[in-house]
Amino acid sequence: MKMNDYKTRLLSEYKELVDRISKLRVFLNKWDNGQLSFVPKPSRAIYSKQLEAMCTYKMCLESRMLTDKISFKEVENV
């Protein structure tokens, strides 16, 4: 695999993860403020655990980016 392919995939994955974390946080804030139009079946604790896992994974990707000297600014170009 070429480094460029690896880098592109890593940046895409990171960008998508950041977007999903943001959307989950918005969802949880709406839930906490009673602004949802439905009642989620899974417990709030499960969603909190999911957010925690996603943030941990984001830190792993950031570590890989730093190790491979991939600039966070490059995420904007993906």
Model-derived segments and spans:
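Extended, charge-rich alpha-helical interface modules
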Residues: M1-V78
